[in-house]
A protein has these predicted regions:
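Conserved phosphotransfer cores of two-component systems
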Residues: 132-134
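Alpha-helical membrane segments in multi-pass integral membrane proteins
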Residues: 128-129, 142
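Generic structural marker for isolated residues within well-ordered, non-membrane alpha-helices
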Residues: 25, 84, 128
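C-terminal binding/interaction regions
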Residues: 159
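Charged helix-capping and loop-helix junction motifs
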Residues: 124-128, 176
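Conserved N-terminal beta1-alpha1 strand-loop-helix module at the mouth
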Residues: 1-77, 90-97, 102-103, 109-117, ...
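Short beta-strand-loop elements within alpha/beta enzyme cores
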Residues: 118-122
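Short, acidic/turn-prone active-site loops that include or flank metal/cofactor-
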Residues: 16, 80-84, 102-104, 123-125, ...
Length: 185
């Protein structure tokens, strides 16, 4: 995936989903193309998985491969590499397995060598740039603000991830996603 033109949106749902989250998610998915949605590990979310997948959005579950399998999600987002092997065994070769690496080059290289489908870094521009220049495994830049998106896309991030800042945007999550998608074009 090339950047910045190939940079895609990756959304992390809030840890606590509000009662109207399905309606908000529907509006967000209609506002822009979302490559991936990360959901918190909660049972009873199969309807959200189906909703996102029905719009062509891959869904990963935070940290719980068994729940990901039970919900029919596309994969799992792991907090570190410790359970990567078990997750791959549980979900199979076709599942998406991403690994959070915070700001660690070493952890990211180990995740890439293990076969992770993507690595995720905290908002560290130089680290994202370094990874994108040297490695083939896609990088997700976990940002705190949509204002950082263009800079990280230009640095080579294949995916821009936003969480709470997007869902709590004063203009509303659909407007925030639409603006972010236009920024990344």
């Amino acid at each position: 995936m090339a950047a910045p033109a190939g940079c895609q949106l990756y959304l992390a749902a809030p840890a606590e989903l509000p009662p109207d989250f399905a309606a908000t998610l529907t509006a967000v998915l209609e506002a822009a193309e979302i490559a991936c949605l990360r959901l918190p590990p909660r049972p009873g979310m199969a309807h959200l998985v189906r909703l996102a997948q029905g719009r062509g959005t891959a869904v990963v579950i935070e940290g719980d491969p068994d729940l990901a399998a039970a919900l029919g999600a596309d994969g799992v987002h792991l907090p570190d590499l410790k359970t990567y092997g078990a997750a791959r065994d549980r979900l199979g070769a076709d599942a998406i397995i991403g690994v959070s690496c915070d700001r660690s080059r070493h952890d990211a290289m180990e995740a890439g060598e293990a076969g992770a489908d993507y690595v995720a870094f905290a908002a560290d521009l130089e680290l994202v740039r370094w990874w994108a220049e040297l490695m083939l495994v896609p990088v997700v830049a976990e940002l705190q603000s949509p204002d950082q998106a263009a800079e990280f896309a230009a640095a080579g991030a294949e995916f821009i991830a936003l969480g709470e800042a997007l869902w709590r945007d004063p203009a509303g999550a659909p407007a925030a996603v639409r603006n972010l998608a236009m920024l990344l074009r």
